[in-house]
Amino acid sequence: MSEVRRPSSSQPAADGAIRHDWTREEAEALYALPFPDLMFRAQSVHRRHFDPTRLETASLLSIKTGGCPEDCGYCSQSAHYDTGLKATKLMDRDTVVATAQRAKAAGAERFCMAAAWRSPKDRDLDQVCDMVSAVKDLGMETCVTLGMLTPPQAQRLKQAGLDFYNHNVDTSPEFYDRIITTRTLQDRIDTLAHVRDAGIKVCCGGIIGMGEAVDDRLGMMVLLANLGAHPDSVPINMWNEVKGVPVNDTAARPDPIALVRLIAVTRIMMPQSVVRLSAGRQYMSDELQSLCLLAGANSIFIGDVLLTTANPQADRDAALLARLGMTSALSVRPAAATAPSETADSSLVA
């Protein structure tokens, strides 16, 4: 099975050396380029580092849902808000492994496990490590997102065979305090450092559509690009409306072309990172998703649910890849024939 090619850090970047000194002004200048010029530049960078016809596919499972003590204003799993979500205990290992087996059969190459914690307790971490080892035995890449980690906890996950750790910065430094008050941005950056020091690959991105300005979206990418090492994966999530959370009061639907521009800028600034088109795809037309892939996105989540929100059905994804002439583990599955999308407005959830 072919894989998304992950270049080594020694390879030169298409627009020059890998940089960690990007400015807001440079990001804004890229974003403001005429659309054809921006897309050409992003696609040129993409082709120097990745196979542009190859898409990475991952599956996401909530192994512990709800009851989180953090007050993230977008999250259905926060105990601070009445979202109607029932908290659950940590899922047992056998159930997780069975779900991973189904995900692999459906075309997923990576299996991501998420727990709604501020930070894991050591006894819970031991169980998660067992899950990681068992999923690795299936021949899948593994990723977890468990909240903040200490250096010893990161080392323990590495010993269990963990490939990726997801810990998003969520938004720009300027907008951050309007979304979260129980965990600082520096807390997040510290955890990213612990993960990287342990030898685990970093998955780190954020959310758009919470009421932030375009400058905030670019500021988030500048923050990520100026870390000591670029994230190995950069997930870009679109805000999905959630009952009872305060972000509902500020959320604004992103313009579809603005999303494509952001992905293109991300690809140029972090040329060797896998850019994942994450939450919100169920509200995107096939045409908009195709533009996102052309701009440099090269990974998606598959499966009908992402944690607590909907996701496109796998058959729709497989049919789109077939129409585009692109490949992934998903594309080897028989795809149900579907008519071309007739969605005209490419609307996104805010």
From Swiss-Prot:
Its EC number is 2.8.1.6. GO terms for molecular function: 2 iron, 2 sulfur cluster binding; 4 iron, 4 sulfur cluster binding; biotin synthase activity; iron ion binding. It holds the Pfam family BATS. Keywords: 2Fe-2S, 4Fe-4S, Biotin biosynthesis, Iron, Iron-sulfur, Metal-binding, S-adenosyl-L-methionine, Transferase. It catalyses: (4R,5S)-dethiobiotin + (sulfur carrier)-SH + 2 reduced [2Fe-2S]-[ferredoxin] + 2 S-adenosyl-L-methionine = (sulfur carrier)-H + biotin + 2 5'-deoxyadenosine + 2 L-methionine + 2 oxidized [2Fe-2S]-[ferredoxin]. Binds 1 [4Fe-4S] cluster. The cluster is coordinated with 3 cysteines and an exchangeable S-adenosyl-L-methionine. SUPFAM superfamilies: Radical SAM enzymes. It comes from the Bacteria. [2Fe-2S] cluster binds at C112, C143, C203, R276. The keyword Translocase does not apply. [4Fe-4S] cluster binds at C68, C72, C75. The keyword Iron-sulfur applies. Belongs to the radical SAM superfamily. Biotin synthase family. HAMAP family: BioB. Homodimer. Catalyzes the conversion of dethiobiotin (DTB) to biotin by the insertion of a sulfur atom into dethiobiotin via a radical-based mechanism. This is Biotin synthase. It comes from Bradyrhizobium sp. (strain BTAi1 / ATCC BAA-1182). The lineage of its organism: Bacteria, Pseudomonadati, Pseudomonadota, Alphaproteobacteria, Hyphomicrobiales.
